[in-house]
UniProtKB/Swiss-Prot annotation:
Classification lineage: Eukaryota, Fungi, Dikarya, Ascomycota, Pezizomycotina
Superkingdom of the source species: Eukaryota
Localization: Cytoplasm
Main location: cytoplasm
Cofactors (names): Zn(2+)
Presence of keyword Cytoplasm: yes
Encoding gene (name): mde1
HAMAP family: Salvage_MtnB_euk
Name of the protein this chain belongs to: Methylthioribulose-1-phosphate dehydratase
Entries under PANTHER family matching the protein: METHYLTHIORIBULOSE-1-PHOSPHATE DEHYDRATASE
Length: 240
């Protein structure tokens, strides 16, 4: 390995005894998400922004086996496109950057501290149900369910209440992950209070101000999606 490559690798950025360090948190989160069935077959991804650094899980690594030394680090801010212009300050030499990177960056540009992408079966199923019931332009809506309180109303607006209606936009899938970026950003603009975007037949992107908020919001949404699927089986409407 050349001296230049060694210098570029900046291993110190992912070496820490602090369990709250992003390089330690991302593998821990990925193991949890794998055990929950959200990120099978190396799918999905997680990214955390800390100050001027963005830490991103790599592509193609089994989520339950991920280690801190697998993590990519970007200087922030950094261009979304073209990929060659992104300011990587640590690149594991034997791994590929996540195809989710430009979508994570779109969330960080809106103030997020963490963004999670899962392939949850419940998320996929609700996109199919919405498409069948409302057509391709429909969004997911649900109300009068206690767990809705786990989702924010919007930046600086507090949390949704029991009687509020949660709305999550849905975008069409594409052949390549990076090509979702434009549609994701349009959905963010059309739904400025949303903290999540569903991808039809694919999964969901969820972001939050910090790791804890992104994780708990993702958990709350997955609960609501599963509940919605079961409600649909029983003929119970999602919005009361």
């Amino acid at each position: 390995m050349s001296q230049g490559l060694q210098q570029q690798n900046n291993d110190h950025l992912v070496q820490s005894d602090d369990p709250e360090h992003p390089a330690n948190l991302i593998p821990e989160l990925c193991r949890k998400f794998y055990n929950w069935g959200w990120v099978t077959g190396t799918g999905g991804g997680t990214s955390i922004r800390r100050g001027e650094h963005i830490f991103i899980a790599p592509s193609g690594v089994q989520k339950e086996l991920m280690q801190p030394h697998n993590i990519f680090v970007l200087q922030y801010p950094t261009p979304k496109y073209p990929p060659s212009e992104r300011k990587y300050i640590r690149k594991p030499l034997d791994l590929k950057p996540s195809a989710c990177t430009p979508l994570f960056l779109a969330a960080f540009e809106r103030g997020a501290g963490c963004c999670i992408h899962t392939h949850s079966q419940w998320a996929v199923l609700v996109t199919l149900l919405v498409e069948r019931e409302k057509g391709p332009e429909g969004c997911f809506e649900i109300s009068n369910i206690e767990q809705i309180k786990g989702i924010p109303k919007g930046p600086g607006k507090g949390m949704l209440g029991y009687f509020d209606t949660l709305r999550i936009p849905i975008i069409d899938n594409t052949a390549f992950e990076e090509d979702l970026t434009g549609s994701l950003e349009k959905a963010m603009d059309a739904y400025p209070d949303t903290y999540a975007v569903l991808v039809r037949r694919h999964g969901i992107y969820v972001w939050g101000d910090n790791v804890a908020k992104a994780k708990t919001q993702c958990e709350s949404l997955d609960y609501l999606f599963q509940l919605a699927v079961e409600m649909h089986k029983l003929g119970i409407p999602w919005v009361k």
